[in-house]
From Swiss-Prot:
Name this protein carries in UniProt: CCA-adding enzyme
Molecular function GO terms recorded: ATP binding; CCA tRNA nucleotidyltransferase activity; magnesium ion binding; tRNA binding
The species this protein was found in: Methanococcus maripaludis (strain DSM 14266 / JCM 13030 / NBRC 101832 / S2 / LL)
Cofactor needs: Mg(2+)
List of residues binding Mg(2+): D69, D71, D124
Iron-sulfur among keywords: no
Pfam families given in the database record: CAA_C (PF21133), NTP_transf_2 (PF01909), tRNA_NucTransf2 (PF09249)
Swiss-Prot/TrEMBL GO biological process terms: RNA repair; tRNA 3'-terminal CCA addition
Role of this protein: Catalyzes the addition and repair of the essential 3'-terminal CCA sequence in tRNAs without using a nucleic acid template. Adds these three nucleotides in the order of C, C, and A to the tRNA nucleotide-73, using CTP and ATP as substrates and producing inorganic pyrophosphate. tRNA 3'-terminal CCA addition is required both for tRNA processing and repair. Also involved in tRNA surveillance by mediating tandem CCA addition to generate a CCACCA at the 3' terminus of unstable tRNAs. While stable tRNAs receive only 3'-terminal CCA, unstable tRNAs are marked with CCACCA and rapidly degraded.
UniProt lineage: Archaea, Methanobacteriati, Methanobacteriota, Methanomada group, Methanococci
Keyword Repeat: no
Family, as annotated: Belongs to the tRNA nucleotidyltransferase/poly(A) polymerase family. Archaeal CCA-adding enzyme subfamily.
Additional free-text comment from the UniProt record: A single active site specifically recognizes both ATP and CTP and is responsible for their addition.
Domain of life, per lineage: Archaea
Subunit structure: Homodimer.
Length: 444
């Protein structure tokens, strides 16, 4: 691709930046309040907390306007008992939020941590262990302070804050920002590493033009940090995009990104560079989806399944995907073609939706067997099929369909008649689900 002329994009990007950059007063207010939180934790802490660190985008001036999230990590010595780490982390978190008359609750990752609201500020107070780069983690969040330290050092000679904001807003517009298992997109940390690698938003979009699935990225800083040669043999990953974590070379930062979302990023990056527009940054995915859905629809079916209590999205979405793919395999085996499928969960219900190209089939189907010269294959075929005949060069037979209407197949699913064929995950069971015809629930 020819070299970009930044002047072709500068007006659009500046307009977007006016919308998404926090004001100086907003930044100052956030810093003052964060310092108060950290100071208070130090005051009330009578426990072996080695360090109290603010991490995340607000700590690195990489947040969007009106993002008032404050992430505080409490680092404990590696010898600290897990139960004690959990107990002390929860107590400190609750105590400091209560001191500021806030509202607190417990969230769950590998171990529980405290989240809360104090006015317009959202807080996460998370205990972790003090580890070094490439040291084996003890808990899943132990790398986060190291990520923060690496990025702050990298930004000392690189002012990339606005480029990071542009990338985040661009990905939000495309509906692919977020590394949760529901979104399967780009995490904030991944965004920062990509901007650091290519030294700018437009440079990144230009580089993306040559990407294909399985593309691999190693930051220049990694070679310097670990004194590695350029031909170093890194661990191989089988993911859509591979971005090596500077603080743990055995980890792929882009592991959560699925193939479709990577390809959306590649495609719409090309579209933006060819025909730049602010539209890409503002609900572009939703507008595009709404336009596509104005067409005449196929045959729509949704299964409504009761969602178990206290099962988080990072558990429920992979299980919905698993059961839906198992059902997809079954409907294909019975010759029903679908145009699309989606899943979505609200607080009470899991929705599995399909749009079928055809919902009713003839009573009979043609079963094509082996070529007539395949002696053993033909013998097996005629043993299991009556009324066989030759069509072109294959022995064939007509079979009566078990399901000629897709609705009947789904009724057997919810009545439990196909439970030996479909793979049931633990928390999403289609038995006794409600079938809604003519309805397709979009993921929100």
């Amino acid at each position: 691709m020819k070299k970009l002329n930044a002047d072709d994009y500068i007006d659009i990007l500046n307009d977007v930046l006016k919308d998404i950059c926090p004001t100086d007063s907003e930044k100052e207010e956030l810093k003052i309040f964060s310092d108060k939180i950290i100071s208070k934790i130090k005051d009330i802490s009578k426990y072996p907390v080695l360090d109290i660190i603010q991490v995340g985008s607000t700590a690195r001036d990489a947040n969007l306007k009106n993002d008032h999230d404050i992430d505080i990590f409490l680092r404990f010595e590696k010898e600290t008992d897990r139960d004690m780490l959990k107990e002390l982390g929860l107590k400190l978190g609750k105590d400091v939020i209560n001191y500021f008359n806030g509202k607190s609750w417990i969230e769950y990752a590998e171990h529980p941590y405290v989240s809360g609201e104090i006015g317009k500020f959202n807080l996460d107070i998370v205990p972790c262990y003090d580890i070094e780069n490439c040291e084996k983690i003890i808990s899943a969040v132990d790398r986060t302070p190291l990520h923060n330290e690496f990025l702050l050092n990298a930004y000392e000679n690189n002012d990339l804050s606005n480029d990071i904001r542009l990338l985040k807003k661009f990905l939000k517009g495309l509906g692919i920002y977020g590394s949760d298992l529901k979104t399967a997109g780009f995490s904030g940390y991944l965004c920062e590493l990509l901007i650091l690698k290519y030294r700018g938003f437009l440079n990144l979009l230009s580089a993306v033009q040559t990407w294909k699935p399985k593309h691999s990225i190693v930051l220049d800083e990694i070679y310097e940090m670990y004194d590695l040669k350029k031909d170093h043999d890194f661990l191989k990953f089988n993911d859509s995009l591979v971005v090596y974590d500077p603080v743990d070379l055995n980890r792929n930062v882009a592991a959560a990104l699925n193939k479709e979302n990577l390809c959306k990023f590649i495609f719409y990056s090309k579209m933006f560079l060819k025909k730049p527009s602010k539209e890409f940054f503002y609900g572009f995915y939703k507008k595009t989806t709404d336009l596509l859905n104005q067409r005449k629809r196929g045959y729509l079916i949704t299964l409504e399944i009761l969602r178990p209590e206290n099962i988080v999205e990072d558990v429920i979405y992979p299980q919905m995907e698993k059961i839906q793919k198992s059902i997809n395999k079954l409907v294909k085996e019975h010759d029903f073609e679908y145009l699309q499928y989606q899943n979505f969960a609200d607080d009470n219900t899991c929705y599995l939706s399909w749009e079928f190209l055809i919902h009713e089939l003839p009573d009979v189907k043609l079963r094509i067997g082996p070529p007539v010269y395949s002696e053993q294959g033909v013998l097996n075929f005629i043993t299991h099929n009556e009324h066989y005949f030759v069509k072109e060069c294959n022995v064939c037979a007509y079979k009566t369909r078990k399901y000629k209407n897709i609705q009947i197949l789904f009724e057997d699913i919810v009545n439990g008649k196909l439970k030996n064929i479909i793979t049931y995950p633990k928390y999403v069971c289609p038995e006794n689900a409600k079938i809604r015809l003519g309805t397709f629930i979009e993921r929100k």
